[in-house]
């Protein structure tokens, strides 16, 4: 019985005794300064703000995400969206509004796809966030 306890205890301690201490952070060299980092995750530094003018230059079917205001209702599910760079027509089905009301002075985020087949180009909105 004592022999089994000793064998069991040695198996429990063995991984710690044989553990390799080569892993973890190696501090052999100094990290690069923040402005010199070329790769890796940098959070919002990588984010490019999309504008209406930039969205109009994209290809048909491109995914767009814009931040601005709905400034007018053109009938049924058609609206005019404006940000700091310009205006674009958008199509927002009632289901996307989901009962929410949006005022022209409220800043909103819209996401959808660019439809350049219609003239002028429109954004078919699939998500709206107040």
UniProtKB/Swiss-Prot annotation:
Source organism, top-level taxon: Bacteria
Key words of the record: Signal
Record-linked PANTHER family: PERIPLASMIC PROTEIN (PTHR36571:SF2), PROTEIN YGIW (PTHR36571)
Protein name in the entry: Uncharacterized protein YdeI
NCBIfam families in UniProt: PRK10053.1, stress_OB_fold, YgiW/YdeI family stress tolerance OB fold protein
Signal peptide location: 1-19
Pfam families from the UniProt entry: BOF
Native source species: Escherichia coli (strain K12)
Region (Disordered): 24-43
Biological process according to GO: cellular response to hydrogen peroxide; single-species biofilm formation on inanimate substrate
Keyword Signal carried by entry: yes
